[in-house]
A protein has these predicted regions:
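Short Gly/Ser/Thr- and Asp/Glu-enriched loop/turn motifs at secondary-structure junctions
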Residues: 31, 92-93, 325-331, 359-363
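Short beta-strands and strand-loop turn motifs
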Residues: 141-144, 168-174, 209-214, 325-327, ...
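Conserved PLP-anchoring active-site segment centered on the Schiff-base-forming lysine
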Residues: 112-133
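PLP-dependent aminotransferase class I/II
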Residues: 46, 236-317, 323-324
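Active-site pre-lysine segment of PLP-dependent enzymes
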Residues: 152-164, 177-246
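PLP-dependent enzyme catalytic core of the Aspartate aminotransferase-like
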Residues: 185, 346-351, 356-391
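N-terminal small-domain helix-loop-helix segment of the aminotransferase-like
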Residues: 8-101, 108
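Conserved PLP-binding catalytic core of the aspartate aminotransferase-like
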Residues: 302, 315-351, 368
Length: 391
């Protein structure tokens, strides 16, 4: 693997004490035939999309001696246009913000609202990068726990808000690594509690921001609402999105934030100047010219997810049917009772199939690939489960 171990850092370097012994975050990047571990869209952009991107980048190359538009106004307008089309929610340019992937969006939110003495609250199990953002911004990371079916435990979450007084409440819909959707009634209850909640170390009248990470929202079932619909109703709501997943644009690193202007202005305080390159902006704008093509495989991936979930429920391990978490994403958390998921991971890898060991013990996650890749996954998993059964 290509990740560099922090344990190899020379002792004479003044690395922060809290970073000593830490490892760089990242899923394995291995050269194997079937990569189903990082929730990418497996289908490459269509030739027409590639041609437009290449042309726009060629045009912008003539101006690379100049800094880009640091407010990326044209791209923010493109975000507005896309969200109105995709979700039916009309927002203004000053309610959108872009960054280098939703990872940078989330980091900017932690920079703006976290910090020493501040607390951020998540709901376990959740995305494993959130505590990394907290660590890097000296924010204390606290957890409420989800229900056994991985749905949001609203009562436990509201009690945690009252007890720990967070500056940020981070929810994920669909949740990663489980795929569980967030019910709008549950979100409204959390937003309502946050509107009057105190923030530890802050002045009276300051209330927490609720961040909903919707990185995988385009994979939701038709008719499922999005948190974007509540932005006009709740001033304390911020919704993070990305072009990396359904939009098949992971390599370009483009994420964006939708919120009321006050939240956007807070994020603008901590952003680096000219953080989105001219090339990134040009490529993203070109991709939006081909929205239909970029999203053309989403319905098929949704069908693949549903078919794979049904198939997994028919499989057994040690005489027990596999558990499959409810999902509205492009990945599935499955297993529930694997005694040694690392063994299963290794055996699958030997057969050229790479998935993830994430989430609670006993569970594994697989993202949806092409039809050929999913056939390889099913064939390999059946063989591996048979081997494990014989142990």
């Amino acid at each position: 693997m290509s990740e560099t171990s922090s344990n190899a850092i020379p002792a004479y370097l003044p690395l922060r004490n809290d970073l000593i012994g830490e490892e760089p975050y990242g899923a394995p990047q291995l050269d194997v035939p079937v990569c189903l571990n990082v929730n990418e869209n497996p289908y490459a952009p269509e030739p027409a999309v590639v041609e437009t991107i290449a042309q726009r980048v060629k045009e912008i190359a003539l101006t690379l001696n100049r800094y880009p538009d640091r407010e990326h106004i044209a791209l923010r307008q493109a975000f507005c246009d896309y969200l109105e089309r995709e979700s039916g929610v009309k927002l203004e340019v000053d309610q959108l913000w872009g960054a280098n992937g939703s990872n940078e969006i989330m980091l900017q939110l932690f920079q703006a609202f976290g910090g020493p003495g501040r607390i951020a609250l998540g709901c376990d199990p959740t995305y494993s990068m959130y505590p990394e953002y907290a660590r890097d911004t000296f924010t204390t990371w606290k957890l409420a726990h989800r229900n056994e079916d991985f749905s949001l435990n609203v009562d436990a979450t509201i009690k945690a808000i009252e007890d720990v007084k967070p500056a940020m409440i981070v929810l994920t819909s669909p949740n990663n690594p489980t795929g569980t959707p967030l019910k709008m009634d549950d979100l409204k209850r959390v937003l309502g509690a946050a509107e009057t909640a105190e923030v530890a170390g802050a002045a009276e009248g300051v209330h927490p921001v609720v961040v909903v990470d919707e990185a995988y929202i385009e994979f939701r079932d038709p008719g499922t609402p999005t948190a974007l619909e509540l932005i006009g109703e709740y001033e304390n709501l911020a919704v993070s999105r990305t072009m990396s997943k359904a939009f098949a644009f992971a390599g370009a690193r483009v994420g964006y934030l939708a919120a009321n202007k006050g939240i956007i202005d807070c994020v603008r305080i901590v952003r680096m100047p000219y953080h989105l390159s001219a090339v990134t902006q040009a490529a993203a704008l070109a991709a939006f010219e081909h929205t239909d093509e970029q999203l053309s495989r989403v319905a098929h991936l949704r069908d693949t997810r549903n078919q794979t979930a049904a198939w997994l429920k028919e499989q057994t391990s040690k005489g027990q049917p596999l558990e499959v978490a409810e999902t509205q994403s492009n990945f599935i958390l499955f297993g529930g009772h694997f005694d040694d998921r690392d063994r299963i991971f290794d055996e699958l890898l030997k057969r050229g199939v790479l998935i993830r060991t994430v989430g609670p013990d006993g569970w594994m996650r697989v993202c949806m690939g092409t039809d050929e890749e999913m056939a390889r996954f099913r064939e390999a998993l059946v063989e591996v489960l048979r081997i494990v059964e014989q142990d």
